[in-house]
UniProtKB/Swiss-Prot annotation:
Protein's UniProt name: Tryptophyllin-T2-9
Subcellular locations according to the entry: Secreted
Tissue-wise expression: Expressed by the skin glands.
Gene Ontology, cellular component aspect: extracellular region
Keywords (A to Z) from UniProt: Amphibian defense peptide, Secreted
Keyword Signal: no
Origin superkingdom: Eukaryota
Biological processes, Gene Ontology terms: defense response
Family stated for the protein in its record: Belongs to the frog skin active peptide (FSAP) family. Tryptophillin subfamily.
Length: 7
């Protein structure tokens, strides 16, 4: 699962 901030 990609971390918050991947967006």
């Amino acid at each position: 699962v990609p971390p918050i901030g991947w967006f």
